[in-house]
């Protein structure tokens, strides 16, 4: 899923993940947070991104951390 998020940011084009449209702003926030956390938390984030509910929680968390 991280590859898809990076693709959304790179191409500036929304895409569907788990049946949800993900816009560039949300994808960018998620990628930024992912890149800033340590390896252990990156693994946890990758695990969360495998389910729709986890993906939504991750998106909400990432958006709350972007100022």
Residue ranges of each PLM-predicted region?
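Charge-dense, intrinsically disordered terminal/linker segments
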Residues: 1-67
């Amino acid at each position: 899923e991280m590859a898809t998020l990076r693709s959304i940011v790179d191409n500036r084009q929304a895409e569907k993940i788990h049946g949800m449209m993900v816009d560039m702003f949300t994808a960018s926030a998620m990628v930024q947070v992912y890149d800033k956390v340590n390896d252990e938390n990156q693994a946890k984030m990758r695990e969360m991104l495998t389910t729709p509910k986890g993906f939504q929680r991750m998106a909400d968390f990432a958006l709350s951390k972007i100022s």
